[in-house]
């Protein structure tokens, strides 16, 4: 089974916080796996001005994006999905991914943090890597 959580926060106005979470599951035999996932986002922003403080919040339903696919790979896999709204001046991205085999042994756990500059339009970064049979494959898709 693979589980993944991604959180990101950004500075917009005087203060704001935005977060996203994504869950993944990986099941199957040693040769074929069914990969499925879903996630959602929520945001809250606070702006200070001479007239006072304005607070707003919004959310994206958890079923906004769902996907499933079959991977013909052995039991090691890593998947990450990130997206950044264009209005963020700068976005600090932190995500952690852990992979477990059937016996519950931890194969790997990784945590990364990076600073993303502003974007003129929404960008979707889709990346997955998997290893097995002596090979490692990586794919990134930018939209």
From Swiss-Prot:
It comes from the Eukaryota. Almost completely overlaps CUE5. This is Putative uncharacterized protein YOR041C. It comes from Saccharomyces cerevisiae (strain ATCC 204508 / S288c).
């Amino acid at each position: 089974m693979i589980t993944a959580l991604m959180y990101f926060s950004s500075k917009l106005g005087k203060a704001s916080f935005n977060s996203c979470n994504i869950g993944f599951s990986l099941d199957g035999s040693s040769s074929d796996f069914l990969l499925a996932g879903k996630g959602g986002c929520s945001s809250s922003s606070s702006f200070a001005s001479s007239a006072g403080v304005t607070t707003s919040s919004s959310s994206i339903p958890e079923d906004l994006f769902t996907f499933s696919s079959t991977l013909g790979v052995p039991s090691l896999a890593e998947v990450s999905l990130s997206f950044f709204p264009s209005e963020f001046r700068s976005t600090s991205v932190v995500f952690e991914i852990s992979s477990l085999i059937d016996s519950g042994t931890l194969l790997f756990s990784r945590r990364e943090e990076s600073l993303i500059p502003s974007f003129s339009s929404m960008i979707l970064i889709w990346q997955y890597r998997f290893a097995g049979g002596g090979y490692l494959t990586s794919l990134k898709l930018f939209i």
